[in-house]
């Protein structure tokens, strides 16, 4: 399945594993926009931006990260549910940690079920093992559209205020001006509506979110949220989460990226 990779911002939820002999086997779940920087902060201690629960207990290894969330809010909600499965109404079917069950194994068990229930089951997520020697098969396995990757995430470009466009695309946008119309319903597109554009080079598709959602859902009757579909113009495969994430990438402020620096749960010394 050939999906266009969208440039944009990185939102990940990671799993740390403690290598300190005194605390070996401890784990920690957190949110980050920069995995390499975040693990350095954890190992440097709370004064350097690490979390209270990890401070002074290193070294820590970031062994696994889930990324591909369409927004920081979506990633933070996933983080909270992974940290507190017993409090999430989505995970009432997941049993508590067994006495003989290691913390690492328990968190993988919870993760396996999270990836199989709404709303996460329909997100374009990637499960990435940063330490392949820690890899375990999840049961149940992730959905087919969620790839399993290994090694560090690919470098992320600096987030521009506006995406770079070719000269031809720029001229096309100028020609459209304020009279741009939806490729599907032919009604006018308003800037505040955030029209979706196909990311494949040269594709002219511009559509209302609701129009493209209805088009995609023709392939998935009975669903409320599209998972994927084929562009009505170029016929190439697209993931819905990538399209929506690309639409909103330019409207979010860079300051939101620092949500990872001081999580409110780090202040609860329990």
Curated annotation (Swiss-Prot):
Keywords, sorted A to Z: DNA damage, DNA recombination, DNA repair, Endonuclease, Hydrolase, Metal-binding, Nuclease, Nucleus, Zinc, Zinc-finger
Assembly and oligomerization: Forms a heterodimer with SLX4.
ZnF SLX1-type span: 182-234
Hydrolase recorded as keyword: yes
Cofactor(s) listed in the protein's UniProt record: a divalent metal cation
GO CC, any one term: Slx1-Slx4 complex
Enzyme Commission (EC) number: 3.1.-.-
Organism (species): Mus musculus (Mouse)
GO process terms (BP): DNA recombination; DNA repair; positive regulation of t-circle formation; t-circle formation
GIY-YIG domain span: 9-94
Pfam families cross-referenced by the UniProt entry: GIY-YIG (PF01541), SLX1_C (PF21202)
Job of this protein: Catalytic subunit of the SLX1-SLX4 structure-specific endonuclease that resolves DNA secondary structures generated during DNA repair and recombination. Has endonuclease activity towards branched DNA substrates, introducing single-strand cuts in duplex DNA close to junctions with ss-DNA. Has a preference for 5'-flap structures, and promotes symmetrical cleavage of static and migrating Holliday junctions (HJs). Resolves HJs by generating two pairs of ligatable, nicked duplex products.
Summary of the tissues where the protein is detected: Expressed in testis, colon, bone marrow, brain, thymus and to a lesser extent in heart, kidney, skeletal muscle and spleen.
Gene3D superfamilies hit by this protein: GIY-YIG endonuclease, Zinc/RING finger domain, C3HC4 (zinc finger)
Cited InterPro entries: GIY-YIG_endonuc, GIY-YIG_endonuc_sf, Slx1, SLX1_C, SLX1_endonuclease, Znf_RING/FYVE/PHD
Family: Belongs to the SLX1 family.
GO MF, any single term: 5'-flap endonuclease activity
Name of the protein in its database record: Structure-specific endonuclease subunit SLX1
